[in-house]
Amino acid sequence: MTKAKKEESEEVPETPSKSYDELLAYLNPIAKPLAGRKLTKKLYKCVKKAIKQKNIRRGVKEVQKFINKGEKGIVVMAGDTLPIEVYCHIPVMCEDRGIPYSYVPSKSDLGAAAGSKRPTCVILIKPHEDYQEAYDECLEDVQALPLPY
């Protein structure tokens, strides 16, 4: 007697994604400057293009290390990360070194944009000539956001 194998379905069940407005309810108090709906979408697209070139730094520890080494780029942080002590020092580091940063509403969407099944709370997008136009557009928009102080 053998066990019957379960048929593996090739279709991945889609999780119902929440709208931008629904995600805003989960933001933590330090999530400023928050990217708007259009800028969030642009940042996710830029992350997807950067991941193809392997031109991205993901995670608090890695981003912190490369900011300290003087690497330049755009820092994108998830606004729904708790506890905030995990990454509350990153904006100060960015401001000291003149690196533009922005918050997006969802860490799971940020992780998905980076090609990961796991949520990601901090990403550093480095410039590259293959997606320079999208990068420059995002850089301009992130620098135009008002700083929280």
Swiss-Prot record:
Its main location: nucleus. The keyword rRNA processing applies. Keywords: Nucleus, Ribonucleoprotein, Ribosome biogenesis, RNA-binding, rRNA processing. InterPro entries: eL8/uL1-like, H/ACA_rnp_Nhp2-like, Ribosomal_eL30-like_sf, Ribosomal_eL8-like_CS, Ribosomal_eL8/eL30/eS12/Gad45, Ribosomal_eL8/Nhp2. GO terms for biological process: rRNA pseudouridine synthesis; telomere maintenance via telomerase. It is found in: Nucleus, Nucleolus. GO terms for cellular component: nucleolus; sno(s)RNA-containing ribonucleoprotein complex; telomerase holoenzyme complex. It comes from the Eukaryota. GO terms for molecular function: RNA binding. SUPFAM superfamilies: L30e-like (SSF55315). Required for ribosome biogenesis. Part of a complex which catalyzes pseudouridylation of rRNA. This involves the isomerization of uridine such that the ribose is subsequently attached to C5, instead of the normal N1. Pseudouridine ('psi') residues may serve to stabilize the conformation of rRNAs. Belongs to the eukaryotic ribosomal protein eL8 family. Component of the small nucleolar ribonucleoprotein particle containing H/ACA-type snoRNAs (H/ACA snoRNPs). Component of the telomerase holoenzyme complex. This is H/ACA ribonucleoprotein complex subunit 2-like protein. It comes from Xenopus tropicalis.
